[in-house]
UniProtKB/Swiss-Prot annotation:
Its main location: membrane. The complex is composed of two ATP-binding proteins (ZnuC), two transmembrane proteins (ZnuB) and a solute-binding protein (ZnuA). It is an enzyme of class 7 (translocase). InterPro entries: AAA+_ATPase, ABC_transporter-like_ATP-bd, ABC_transporter-like_CS, Metal_Ion_Import_ABC, P-loop_NTPase. This is Zinc import ATP-binding protein ZnuC. One of its GO terms (biological process) is response to zinc ion. It is found in: Cell inner membrane.
Length: 260
């Protein structure tokens, strides 16, 4: 098991909060991740894409600290705080609880922070509803708000738009972009919606069989042969979710061994 080590020295604003170097993960003798390098940087949205079984969720769980590594190194900045929103969240039907009470269980927020997060995530009208009655999109907003109440420096989101219609997906990604700018946190996302990935991300990592096949700015990754082999070059119609100049997508896509 590879130990987690603190990042040494004083942190600059653009220094990585988490760094993975040559990380490998195995389950039952089977290789899940191999030679993965990643830097989680404040203010950057990094999106993990790949087919089912490529290792995306395992990599996100390594970032969060829920999965141990078999090789490589994981560094974390002192006092790094991670807000994790899993893809699946089940509510015990025998334990009725309102969204307000569920959010309050985070235990970190003062009144000012509570009001700020509730306003930013638009969950005011949901607070007194039982969790069991919330839709998938509403539940994800509550989970995101609860994560933000914990003052995270890193937000880790596993398929946050899964099961949502196009309008709800667009609204959620706009919200994530706004929160990144407002709170300055790093964001690591798993997504299968390639239109939104290209519009919302600063960096895209494309995984295949547990390795990073290519990485870089979205517009350059889509031209990379490894990406096109997996997904083709066509993204489908423009969603109109973000303006085309939302990010500067210039710069080369790197092969998997490049710097994270």
């Amino acid at each position: 098991m590879s130990p987690v080590q603190p990042l040494a020295g004083r942190q600059a604003a653009d220094d990585p909060l988490i760094r993975l170097q040559e990380v490998a993960v195995t389950f039952g003798g089977r290789s899940i991740l191999q030679d993965v390098r990643l830097e989680v940087v404040p203010g950057r949205i990094t999106t993990l894409v790949g087919n089912n079984g490529a290792g995306k969720t395992t990599l996100l769980r390594v970032v969060v600290g829920l999965t141990h590594t078999a090789a490589g190194r994981v560094w974390r900045a002192p006092q790094v705080r991670i807000g994790y929103v899993p893809q699946h969240f089940s509510v015990d039907a025998n334990l009725p609880i309102t969204a307000r009470r569920f959010m309050a269980l985070s235990g970190r927020a003062n009144a000012a922070r509570w009001q700020e997060v509730v306003a930013d995530t638009g969950v005011e009208e949901l607070l007194d509803q039982p969790l069991q009655g919330l839709s998938g999109g509403e539940m994800r907003r509550i989970l995101l708000a609860r994560a933000l109440l914990q003052h995270p420096s890193v937000l880790a989101l596993d398929e946050p738009a899964a099961g949502l219609d196009g309008r709800s997906q667009g609204a959620l990604y706009r919200l994530i972009g706004t929160l990144r700018q407002r709170y300055g946190c790093a964001v690591v996302i798993i997504s299968h919606d390639l239109n939104l990935v290209m519009a919302a991300s600063d960096e895209v990592l494309c995984l295949e069989h547990g390795r990073i096949a290519c990485r870089g700015a979205p517009a350059s990754v889509i031209e990379h042969p490894e990406y096109q082999k997996l997904f083709g070059s066509h993204l489908g119609p423009d969603t109109g979710v973000f303006p085309h100049d939302h990010h500067d997508h210039s710069g080369p896509a790197l092969a998997g061994g490049g710097r994270g």
